[in-house]
A protein has these predicted regions:
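Residues forming the flavin
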Residues: 1-51, 58-156, 160-526
Length: 526
């Protein structure tokens, strides 16, 4: 196969147009191309009067002479090589069933290791009902919510699959998702997403594959303790929601609990498991009319059916040394209640596959360093998050209504009394207020500077009626659970801290890749 990159395709261009351009680049007749596969497709909107796609394709054709063109290369077929290991006397245990745990369990199952999975939250079918109930009534289930349950926090985020990782295992993740029913376009879109409406079905299909290969998945079952003897993992104590605790023996434990498993972090600390503070970011969600973002990004081409809703990714560096950036941008989406602890309020963003909602939203975040925590305790960052979430809960009215403020009012430091053109999407409801009442001064001041600077990059970003919804604290884990080159804990042999919660990933793909890497080490370990 021959790979051709940087082919320009007009917005109304067809596969036949792509084929003709590929043939032209190869200096052959189009009919000589036996097959053409789209490998990557992205939008080039740098010139607003010429918005188009940039494509990479693989073609199969006879070629007498290879063109001297750096954009034409031999395509290397990807094939994931499953590690070969021996069956063990004790089955490996996976704790957590988000992206890291899901793919760790899948690889273990495909390798014949018959993993046993424990997830504190519910299966995705019941989880969706629990989350919908919380959004409607404000009645939180601390064990099953936007953070906990099958699929992890990413299930209610848009299913964004874009990643900075260059690890080839990312292709394995995408192929497994497509095999589980996700849209095939995630294999080639530059910014792939499955959508909150479609991701649950794909997650369920992967779970069913794990079960068919001899694995077990226990939902509504929390791990209360890790048993360690002579610096070796010997088992876990688990507590089903409606049954007595029991112990499971294992000498291989993948801990993939996500960034919000705060009781697990406290348990690890009590066991003396080495961990350290980690930088993260906090801020709020910002909502604009999606049509405004479309016009700012695509100009006269805004609304073109082949473009869909526009996104953005912005970052600025302030004179005070802080970084401010947008994160987890959700075109045509909603701001959602993402709390997992009573008395604490958290926001997140999500959108369905069609991305056809009226508003665009993204987190606008300020970098937070360990010196901001006010304590050297390894969990000080987690306690910092809790303080912000408690303040947001208080300011919102102590009923999971979120504090909101118009951008114009936020910039002027005056409370919002009435909302403007942008209608909030957050449920169960919102409370107009002054966000300075629930954000640290350095965060609020940095956000104000950031919004004005970002408006220079994206026209309309500082729109007065744009809406800020607080507080966003779960952009990444506040701790890193230390591990060695074999991916095992520095203290406990057989304990594999994994994924975003352990501080080694950020997002669905990188977490899933880390889950695969940990599973490989479990399989190959002596």
């Amino acid at each position: 196969m021959i790979r051709i990159s940087e082919i320009q395709l007009q917005l109304d261009g067809t596969e036949e147009d792509l084929k003709k351009q590929a043939a032209s680049r190869l200096k052959i007749a189009p009919e000589k191309i036996r097959s053409l596969t789209l490998v990557k497709k992205s939008v080039d909107a740098r010139k607003k009067d010429n918005v188009h796609f940039i494509c990479t394709v693989d073609v199969d054709c006879p070629l007498e002479r290879f063109p001297k063109d750096s954009k034409i290369t031999q395509a290397e077929a990807y094939h994931y090589a499953l590690p070969q290991g021996k069956p063990r006397a004790l089955r490996p245990v996976v704790v957590g069933f988000g992206p890291a745990g899901l793919f760790a369990a899948l690889i273990l199952a495909q390798a014949g290791q018959r993993p046993v999975v424990f997830e504190r939250g519910s299966a995705v079918e019941n989880r969706q009902k629990q989350v919908a109930h919380f959004w409607k009534t404000g009645a939180l289930n601390p064990a099953c919510n936007v953070q906990f349950g099958e699929g992890g926090a990413g299930t209610f985020s848009d299913g964004k699959l874009n990643t900075g990782t260059k690890d080839s295992r990312a292709r394995k993740v995408l192929e497994e998702f497509v095999g589980a029913g996700a849209p095939a376009e995630i294999l080639y879109m530059a910014k792939p997403h499955i959508g909150t409406d479609r991701l649950p079905g794909a997650v369920k299909a992967i779970r069913e594959q794990i079960l068919s290969l001899g694995g077990e998945v226990h939902f509504d079952t929390a791990v209360q303790n890790i048993l360690i003897k002579d610096e070796n993992v010997t088992g876990v104590e688990v507590k089903p929601q409606d049954a007595a605790p029991y112990t499971v023996a294992t000498d291989r434990l993948i801990l993939a609990v996500g960034h919000s498993a705060r009781d697990t972090f406290e348990m690890l600390y009590s066991l003396g498991i080495p961990m350290e503070q980690k930088p993260f970011s906090v801020g709020a969600r910002i909502e604009h009319p999606q049509c405004m973002i479309d016009r700012a990004q695509y100009g006269k081409f805004a609304g073109h059916p082949n473009l869909g809703a526009a996104d953005y990714k912005l970052a600025v560096h302030l004179e005070n040394g802080r970084g401010v950036y947008t994160f987890c941008m959700c075109p045509g989406g909603s701001v959602v209640a993402a709390a997992s602890e009573p008395g604490r309020l958290v926001t997140n963003g999500m959108s369905n596959f069609a991305r056809n909602g009226e508003n665009a939203n993204a987190a606008i975040l300020v970098g937070v360093e360990p010196q901001d925590f006010g304590d050297e305790h390894p969990l000080a960052g987690m306690y910092f998050q809790r303080r912000l979430e408690s303040e947001a809960f208080r300011v919102g009215g102590e009923n999971y209504f979120a504090p909101v403020q118009r951008v114009e009012d936020f910039l002027k430091r005056v409370p919002t009394k009435l909302l403007g053109d942008v209608k909030p999407t957050y449920l169960p409801g919102v409370t107009p207020c002054n966000l300075d009442d629930c954000l640290p001064d350095f965060v609020a001041d940095s956000m104000r500077q950031g919004i004005l600077l970002m408006n220079r990059k994206l026209n309309g970003f500082s729109y007065g009626d744009a809406l800020l919804t607080a507080v966003e604290t779960r952009s990444s884990s506040p701790v890193r659970v230390l591990r060695g080159e074999n991916l095992q804990s520095l203290l406990a042999k057989g304990l594999f801290p994994c994924g975003e919660g352990a501080g080694y990933a950020g997002g669905i793909i990188s977490a899933a890749v880390d889950g695969i890497k940990c599973a490989e080490q479990v399989i190959l370990a002596p």
